[in-house]
Amino acid sequence: MSVGKTTLVNALKNSPEFKDYHFRTERSKHLMNLGIPLNTDSTLKGQLVFASERAAELMQEKIITDRTVIDVMAFADLSESMKDHEKFYLNATLFYLIKEYDILFYVSPEGVEIEDNGVRETNAEYRTAVDEKIKQIVGMYRKNTITIKGTVEERIEQVKKAVAQYV
């Protein structure tokens, strides 16, 4: 889903405030090249790969990532290939990891054009469905989420401000 999360994380790498942080960005293209189906074609096995990457990230201190277990939960819920019970049990397990994030940002897609990177789904309706699902999951399980939007520069400042208040 193209909302500028990877762009934001890559921009934060250049900020002196985050020099001691580890950064991780999406690996969808790499995983697709391994034969893992994405988007509406995603499978339980594929979502388990994504989930294991997100869980591994949570074992590190001072990490900034553009994906969370919430993304995995949303994409699993919207998969047309997964069975309902697979979605339920995967998401019921991932639910326990949501609290592991020190700060969780919801990055609004408002004003961001869908970018065709050859991997992500470019269907605007699907993008909206993913966004709505993410907001639903966040609303149910993580009340203290910070919404950021605007230009990349504005988003950087919003992240810096939130992190400065936390640390």
Label the predicted regions.
Residues K5:
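Conserved lysine of the Walker
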Residues E26, R67-V69, Y106-G111:
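Short loop/turn segments at strand-loop or loop-helix junctions that form parts
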Residues Q158-Y166:
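C-terminal alpha-helix
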Residues E80-E153, E157-Q158:
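A glycine- and Lys/Arg-enriched "phosphate-lid" helix/loop adjacent to the NTP-binding pocket
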Residues L8:
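Hydrophobic positions on the alpha1 helix immediately C-terminal to the Walker A/P-loop
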Residues Q47-K99:
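Glycine-rich phosphate-binding loop used to anchor ATP phosphates in small-molecule kinases
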Residues K13-A56:
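Conserved substrate/cofactor phosphate-moiety recognition/catalytic segment
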Residues S2:
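Walker A (P-loop) phosphate-binding loop of P-loop NTPases
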